[in-house]
Amino acid sequence: MKTKRILTTGASLVVAALALAGCSSGNSEAAAGAQTDSGGKITVWVDPPRVPAAEAFQEAYPDIEIDVVQIDGTVGGKTVKQSFANFDSAGSGWPDAIFFPSNDDIAWATNSTSNYAADLTDLLPDVIEGYDPAVLSFCEIDGKIRCLRNDAAPDVFWYNKAFFDENGYSLPTTWEGYAELAAKIATEHPGKISGFLGDAYAVNRYLQGSGCPTNDRVSETEAHIDLGDPACVRATELLTEMYDAGALSTQGIFDGDAAEAGANLVMSPGAVWWGNYLFRDTWKIPAGQMSAVAPLAWEGESKPSTGNEGGGLWGVSSHITGKQLENALTFATFVATDPRWQVDLSVGLPGYGPLQQRWLDKQRKAGYLAEFDDAAAAFVLAATIVRPDRDYTRYNTGTVWTHTITPALTSGRSFTDAWSTFGDRLIREARTFGYAVQSTA
């Protein structure tokens, strides 16, 4: 029998998940580190947007008994991490597969204390082969593939084609040109904006997009953070120029009242999934207005430079074996590679390469984006050129950003002041999570 258990966030998740331990462990008295086999039944944890993926799996594999537990999907949230700390202490209770709410979760899920996420290198070699190395690079930790990407979420350069056509503007090709045009548009069209600063992914759009070393993992216990690096300096100069010109919103893209600002967005770097999730489904921007081109390059550099926003990670438990592991791997393979989820239901470009064209064909048929051929080419290119110099760490840079930059700007402080606060807090946060920090900032 298939069952589905929807759990709320907070302490109730921890208690209920512990109660489910017997469903996934097969032996509640197993010592910590011992692999167990339930005989086939699996428990999977998913956030709300991934519930349809689990339901599609249930329909495709009715003979596999599965508990589906809905968890808190807050990026940067601590509920899941707290649950896992309890499981690690008890030596049982872990889900057999999980969609990590935050990509940074893979850092604690693979450290020597937890070691939850299984090494998939030899378990799913054919699946791994289907990914572009640039897409899967975030799952490679110390030479081992410890997760699978759900979707490729590279930043492309989005723009409102209707606005550009109406006003005769030419698209920028460099970051510096973007800042200059953003300031010009803010002056000539007050209220029009060219980006958002208030969400955690602003770090990826602008700092990762510049190569600023905020998340340079040296080892499990050492990180390199250098906000005085030229790549950080150019990013902050760019943001200062646009912010001072009134071209950037201090809101975040996920804010409940961001739709009004979103309707006034004329251009911005942003993830592939912005097209369906933000523009179409959340902000209700009419079809035929938005399109995308390739990511921007920095002046003096020949290649585009872009970040990555999300593109969630699937993990499989290292604590299981036998039929339980086999079924968990079947689940992981399905959610990563099966078109019944990745093409039919998912809003983002599949991380798994062989499905990308099918997803693009579906988007073309839907007819939402303007200049679809240009957008599709940008999506595919961007997925292969995301800057590799940002690792997932136990400290969450995006959370530090929203706790420092956002409140500083909304209280009227300058971006320079906000940046200083961010830098100090980031280094303290990294040290709090056990990293020795190499820094000249």
Which role fits each region the language model picked out?
Residues D155-Y159, W314-V316:
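Short glycine- and hydrophobic/aromatic-rich loop-to-beta-strand nucleating segment
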Residues I141-D142, R146-N150, D155, A179-I225, ...:
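Extracytoplasmic/periplasmic solute-binding protein
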Residues A53, A231-L238, G322-V335, A418:
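Short amphipathic alpha-helical coupling segments at ligand-binding clamshell hinges
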Residues S102-P154, S291-A294:
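Hinge/lid segment of periplasmic solute-binding proteins
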Residues G275-P286, E299-H403, F433-A441:
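C-terminal lobe and pocket-closing loops
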Residues K78-W94, T110-S112, F163-F164, A183-T187, ...:
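Short helices/loops that flank or line small-molecule/ion binding pockets
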Residues A182, E222-Q251, A294-W298:
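Glycine-centered hinge/linker elements that transmit conformational signals in sensory
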Residues K2-A107, L171, K323, V343, ...:
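Conserved N-terminal structural module of periplasmic/extracytoplasmic solute-binding proteins
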